[in-house]
Each structure stands twice: as C-alpha cells, then as structure tokens.
Amino acid sequence: YETEKNNGAGYFLEHLAFKGTKNRPGNALEKHLSSVSRVYEEDAVPGLTPCRNALVSHLDGTTPVCEDIGRRIPLAEWESRYFYDQCPAVAGYGPIEQLPDYNRIRSGMFWLRF
C-alpha cells in the first residue's frame, strides 16, 4: 500500500528492483547493474578479470576450502606439540650481565605449555 510518505525515489527503485514492472521482471534491474559493473571492471582494471577467472578455475567448489580449514591445527596445540620441553637457544649481544641463567630459562619452558 502506498501513501504520500513512502512515495519517494528510494521506494520506487526498491519496488522496481524487487517486484518489477509490467514489461520487466523483478530481477532485470539487478542483472543490468551487474552487467554494467562487469563492463566497468573490465575497462578499469584489465588484469583483474583474467586473474579472477584463473582463481575461480582452480577452485572445484567448497570442499578444498573446508578441508583446508579442517586440517589446521590450533596454535595452542601446535606449540605444545612442537615447543614443549625443547632446549632454547639463547644469544646475547652486548652486555649480558642482566641476561638470566640458561638453566633458569630452560626450566621456564615448562610454563609455556599452559
């Protein structure tokens, strides 16, 4: 239902985009705008379209992306698996009077697990 309050240009465009007119279906405006933006992108950034096409052609769908996400190891698990109880390498440059003792640093590696 239409009143004077909602009879603006925005309402008209929304009505045109979603409901269409007698001569054009509801998605005609969307298709036209996407074709215009596609032509603009091809003219403005000539290397973008071949790059995008190459990227899309390498994706076989969502399966590889989901598999990659599923195979990631959480950082806490990774560091506890590989860094726990390892001997650290300590290097000092310049005066080393304030550098803690190596055994103290090594014993502190236990606390990095938690």
Swiss-Prot record:
One Pfam family name from the record? Peptidase_M16
* UniProt keyword terms in alphabetical order: Acetylation, Electron transport, Membrane, Mitochondrion, Mitochondrion inner membrane, Respiratory chain, Transport
InterPro entries xref list: Metalloenz_LuxS/M16 (IPR011249), Pept_M16_N (IPR011765)
Q: Where in the cell is it found?
A: Mitochondrion inner membrane
A GO-annotated cellular component: mitochondrial inner membrane
Write out the GO MF terms. Answer: metal ion binding
Q: Which residues carry this modification: N6-acetyllysine?
A: 31
How does this chain sit within the bilayer? Peripheral membrane protein
- Reading the lineage from the top rank, the first entry is Eukaryota
Does the keyword Zinc-finger belong to this entry? no
Q: Does the keyword Hydrolase belong to this entry?
A: no
Alphabetical list of Gene3D superfamilies matching this protein: Metalloenzyme, LuxS/M16 peptidase-like
| Subunit field text | Component of the ubiquinol-cytochrome c oxidoreductase (cytochrome b-c1 complex, complex III, CIII), a multisubunit enzyme composed of 11 subunits. The complex is composed of 3 respiratory subunits cytochrome b, cytochrome c1 and Rieske protein UQCRFS1, 2 core protein subunits UQCRC1/QCR1 and UQCRC2/QCR2, and 6 low-molecular weight protein subunits UQCRH/QCR6, UQCRB/QCR7, UQCRQ/QCR8, UQCR10/QCR9, UQCR11/QCR10 and subunit 9, the cleavage product of Rieske protein UQCRFS1.
Name the job this protein performs: Component of the ubiquinol-cytochrome c oxidoreductase, a multisubunit transmembrane complex that is part of the mitochondrial electron transport chain which drives oxidative phosphorylation.
Query: What is the similarity comment for this entry?
Result: Belongs to the peptidase M16 family. UQCRC1/QCR1 subfamily.
- Protein name in UniProt: Cytochrome b-c1 complex subunit 1, mitochondrial
User: Whose protein is this, by species?
Assistant: Mesocricetus auratus (Golden hamster)
The organism's taxonomic lineage, starting at the top: Eukaryota, Metazoa, Chordata, Craniata, Vertebrata
